[in-house]
Amino acid sequence: MTQVTFKHNPVTLVGTERKVGDKAPNFTVVNRDLEEVTLHDYDGKVRLISVVPSIDTSVCSTQTRKFNEEASNLDNTVVLTISVDLPFAQKKWCAAEGLPNAITLSDHRDLSFGEAYGVVMKELRLLARSVFVVNAAGEIVYTEVVPEGSDHPNYEAAIEAAKKA
């Protein structure tokens, strides 16, 4: 299991750790309009899943903006930003940041995504900063669980994986 810290304090990750080559497990989350969304809703597309502890912090905000800007140049690719923030907070953030088309999804109800991908920080009930790229066939082709929650992910590696997917 990947070891991570949040604000330099060790945390326990809960769920099934995912690796490159795994079939991406389905999950159910909620969009900003309180509608259920699943991974399968985006079948046939490359999915860059950007996971943030809370969208309304500086690193999470930068991560969401950067992936949405970079991926807008990629064909057949969708960026899904997932956190446990309430959908209302995600909607407010998107409006304030001028990203009305960003897809933000909330895992607040039952941590379906977090447990399926092994990124629930047990002590905090937040998701660990991470990135997963799933190709159009549903296979995980890139994973990164950022060792320290306040650090940035490797944007370039994730975008490159999405390009190759």
Curated annotation (Swiss-Prot):
Residues 18-164 form the Thioredoxin domain. Pfam families: Redoxin. The active site is at residue 60. The keyword Disulfide bond applies. Its EC number is 1.11.1.24. It is an enzyme of class 1 (oxidoreductase). GO terms for molecular function: thioredoxin peroxidase activity. It catalyses: a hydroperoxide + [thioredoxin]-dithiol = an alcohol + [thioredoxin]-disulfide + H2O. Thiol-specific peroxidase that catalyzes the reduction of hydrogen peroxide and organic hydroperoxides to water and alcohols, respectively. Plays a role in cell protection against oxidative stress by detoxifying peroxides. The active site is a conserved redox-active cysteine residue, the peroxidatic cysteine (C(P)), which makes the nucleophilic attack on the peroxide substrate. The peroxide oxidizes the C(P)-SH to cysteine sulfenic acid (C(P)-SOH), which then reacts with another cysteine residue, the resolving cysteine (C(R)), to form a disulfide bridge. The disulfide is subsequently reduced by an appropriate electron donor to complete the catalytic cycle. In this atypical 2-Cys peroxiredoxin, C(R) is present in the same subunit to form an intramolecular disulfide. Belongs to the peroxiredoxin family. Tpx subfamily. HAMAP family: Tpx. Homodimer. NCBIfam families: PRK00522.1. This is Thiol peroxidase. It comes from Listeria monocytogenes serotype 4b (strain F2365).
